[in-house]
């Protein structure tokens, strides 16, 4: 059981998620915010992180250099872009810092790079830090085992108009969980959207539909549909704080782990 505060740093502090992470760090008594990093040339360099997040002064001026903050934190929390996350993970591996990665949109090669860095430092990488979503994945395993081979499976996800990647990392993870449970290869059975004359649906496929609109924080539904009945398993997030709190929980857990690549299922003791 930890008795000392976990020292964290946050990258991309000016973004919507970054500001929420700062607020979460302020709220949690066992978290100490040591640094907030922004891109070089940002007009926010030197601004107090707490003032930026609207939670009052925290005496943490925003910097543009991880090197300058190297002695101020033990775990980096990163919700940026795949390219930036790779740079940050490389830096952490070289400097003995753990890292929690909530970034989505990685390609296969980038994921392999993260795995290589994780041989040198502890890494939690998860497309969704919300506790409820990670429970959702366990429920999907059960549903797929019981109904998967006898139903049409669709995954529907919705996010705000500013989200850059589609389908979301969470939706893809849902597909991976279902496909793995059923012994299928998601790369071969996934159908991303439909248009025109598509013909009768192939039951071996897993369909994906994406919504980008307004300020939707995050909604995900897995649909198992047969003739005469269907089951829908849904998670809806109404605030980014659920992701931020999950990231803080991951940081608190990760600081006590050896080098390796972990996910939120392990953080939460679900596997």
From Swiss-Prot:
Identify the keywords attached in UniProt to this record, alphabetized: Amino-acid biosynthesis, Cytoplasm, Diaminopimelate biosynthesis, Lysine biosynthesis, NAD, NADP, Oxidoreductase
Query: Which residues does UniProt mark as catalytic?
Result: 159, 163
Which positions are annotated as binding (S)-2,3,4,5-tetrahydrodipicolinate?
160, 169-170
What does the record list as GO biological process? diaminopimelate biosynthetic process; lysine biosynthetic process via diaminopimelate
Top enzyme class of this protein?
Answer: oxidoreductase
At the top level, the lineage of the source is Bacteria
A Pfam family it matches: DapB_N
What reaction gets catalysed by this protein?
(S)-2,3,4,5-tetrahydrodipicolinate + NAD(+) + H2O = (2S,4S)-4-hydroxy-2,3,4,5-tetrahydrodipicolinate + NADH + H(+); (S)-2,3,4,5-tetrahydrodipicolinate + NADP(+) + H2O = (2S,4S)-4-hydroxy-2,3,4,5-tetrahydrodipicolinate + NADPH + H(+)
What InterPro entries is this protein classified in?
DapB_C (IPR022663), DapB_N (IPR000846), DapB_N_CS (IPR022664), DHDPR_bac (IPR023940), NAD(P)-bd_dom_sf (IPR036291)
Entry's family note: Belongs to the DapB family.
Record protein name field: 4-hydroxy-tetrahydrodipicolinate reductase
Write the lineage as a comma-separated list. Answer: Bacteria, Pseudomonadati, Pseudomonadota, Gammaproteobacteria, Alteromonadales
Give the gene name.
Answer: dapB
């Amino acid at each position: 059981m930890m008795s000392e505060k976990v020292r964290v740093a946050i990258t991309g502090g000016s973004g919507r998620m970054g500001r929420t992470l700062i607020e979460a760090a302020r709220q949690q008594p066992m978290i100490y915010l040591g640094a907030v990093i922004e891109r070089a040339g940002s007009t926010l360099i030197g601004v107090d992180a707490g003032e930026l997040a609207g939670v009052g002064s925290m005496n943490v001026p925003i910097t543009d250099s991880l090197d300058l903050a190297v002695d101020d934190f033990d775990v980096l929390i990163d919700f940026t872009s795949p390219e930036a996350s790779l740079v940050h993970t490389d830096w952490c591996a070289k400097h003995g810092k753990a890292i929690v990665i909530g970034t989505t949109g990685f390609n296969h090669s980038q994921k392999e790079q993260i795995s290589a860095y994780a041989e040198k430092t502890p890494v939690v990488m998860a497309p969704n830090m919300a506790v409820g979503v990670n429970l959702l994945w366990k429920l999907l395993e059960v549903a797929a085992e019981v109904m998967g081979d006898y139903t049409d499976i669709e995954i529907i996800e919705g996010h705000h108009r500013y989200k850059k990647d589609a389908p979301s990392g969470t939706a893809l993870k849902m597909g991976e969980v279902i496909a793995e449970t059923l012994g299928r290869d998601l790369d071969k059975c996934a159908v991303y959207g439909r248009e025109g004359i598509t013909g009768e649906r192939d039951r071996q496929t897993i369909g994906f539909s994406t919504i980008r609109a307004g300020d939707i924080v995050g909604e995900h539904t897995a649909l198992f549909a047969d003739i005469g009945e269907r089951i829908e398993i849904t998670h809806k997030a109404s605030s980014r704080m659920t992701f931020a709190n999950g990231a803080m929980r991951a940081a608190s857990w990760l600081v006590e782990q050896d080098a390796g690549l972990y996910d939120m299922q392990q953080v939460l003791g679900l596997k």
